[in-house]
């Protein structure tokens, strides 16, 4: 009998690439999400799908529903993929002792998700970090970065150009934890890591296109060789003894070589398709490390591998057109289809992208936003 894995937060391309990775190794993959129709539920590789309440608005109902699914399905592994990891880790003692949940402790996940705490950890390890302004009076030049200490996908991140804009943001976010930092120049680089008790492997990709201006969610990426960023990432994970999958984001000024640490994503990251396409099968390695299965540790990552998120580029194009901020160079890049793989489309599974499009369309109608 094949092993069963239940994956949560499966509306997007990340869950899709995890599902494909595990299914390729004859693992029966079941998915669960707040939505019934999405990229995973319409894939031919899924064995079954479930719906649960919003984990961030209905925590008790979410956990209760997960327990019902687990009791019915009896999976070997419950695999959280995004910020619901925190909710599951917080309630870990409510799950059966035989169930493998490959995430860190709630306390560690919460600390690493906090940009102020993670930046302090990085700075203590001599990892280059942007300067933090503790008082508005200390800001002498603009733009700066103003952001909530806990957020994702470039949400709640702003680049005020004046003291008036900054003060307005401070007023709007009164009572919430926020951070003011110097704005780093350069391009987004991300380090995808897997760390076990006797294992560490990482790959680095450079962003070619980001969905929002100033960085954030990437829609096109290329694998690069950047040992310095890998070393910085390993320092941080070793320091906190983090086990599992993790992403580190940096800004790099390629003209000066100046590096700036941005954040830690103590979970699977949006660019997951890129390392997988390059030969670094992160989901399967993660699964093996926690289940005791063997895998090929002679990992050869193919530098230069490029991937593209098709729907993400469409959303990016629309967003740039609406805001009148589309350059000829970026238009040419968005219309490029010369890639090694696509995040959300495979010829052997054409229906899946229809599920993704359906999900985004429903969110657009409901929320009037292109960033769900």
Give the label of every model feature segment.
Residues 1-103, 357-371:
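ATP-binding N-terminal substructure of ATP-dependent carboxylate-amine bond-forming enzymes
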Residues 228-248, 252, 266-317:
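Active-site "cap" helix and flanking loop/linker of ATP-utilizing ligase/carboxylase catalytic domains
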Residues 161-236, 240-241, 251-252, 258-260:
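Phosphate-binding site of ATP-dependent enzymes
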Residues 96, 107-128:
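Glycine-/Pro-rich loop/turn segments that contact NAD(P) or position catalytic residues
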Residues 122, 131-134, 140-159, 175-186, ...:
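ATP-grasp fold ATP-binding core
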Residues 118-123, 180, 233, 286:
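Structural element of the ATP-grasp superfamily
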Residues 288-372:
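Peripheral (often C-terminal) accessory segments that flank ATP-dependent C-N-forming ligase machineries
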Residues 49-57, 131-135, 158-161:
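Short acidic-hydrophobic, aromatic-tinged amphipathic segments that line or gate anion-handling sites
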